[in-house]
A protein has these predicted regions:
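Polytopic transmembrane helical bundles with strong interfacial aromatic enrichment
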Residues: 1-165
Length: 165
């Protein structure tokens, strides 16, 4: 499985690089994100396999109630990384370089305009004002959510003693 995942990730890596060799000197945002997602999947699989070898299930693991935070933490973290890949490839940080507001608004008005929600704006994101605003907003919002989850995780982790195996 590892070799297959690595081969797929490498193949998409070449597809991603090839997308930047033709009309423009940068790669396609979606191809970059697919390559990044495959890399995250490969890394996660390798980490999971390593942990299964180092800590067999019979041994168990210490528990103090933080387990309920791990799934949301991992999901939002991976979402944040994927949105970061789209942001990087689409160069949306150039459009909204300021923080915490985006050109004076928390939620840019272009996102709330129903007429902007077209496939064309997602496909041709370089000519669109909608896609950079949406991706930047989602990336920032998921970062805020990630901070809340990490704080909840840390409060839970440090407020209870670890029970023995």
């Amino acid at each position: 499985i590892t070799v297959l995942l690595a081969a797929i990730a490498a193949s998409f890596g070449w597809i991603m690089v090839a997308s930047g060799l033709h009309d423009r000197p940068w790669v396609n945002a979606y191809k970059l994100t697919i390559h990044l997602s495959l890399g995250i999947t490969l890394f996660s699989y390798l980490l999971w396999t390593t942990l299964k070898v180092l800590y067999p299930l019979e041994q168990g693991y210490p528990q103090n109630g933080v387990e309920k935070w791990l799934k949301p933490l991992n999901i939002v973290l991976v979402l944040q990384l994927i949105l970061g890949g789209i942001m990087s490839g689409a160069r949306t940080a150039i459009v909204y370089p300021e923080w915490p507001l985006m050109k004076g608004e928390f939620l840019p008005s272009v996102i709330t305009d129903i007429n902007m929600w077209t496939v064309e704006n997602f496909v041709n994101y370089e000519q669109s004002v909608f896609q950079p605003a949406l991706i930047q907003f989602l990336h920032r919002t998921s970062a805020y959510l990630l901070i809340i989850i990490v704080i909840g995780y840390l409060i839970q982790a440090f407020s209870r003693p670890i029970t023995p195996w």
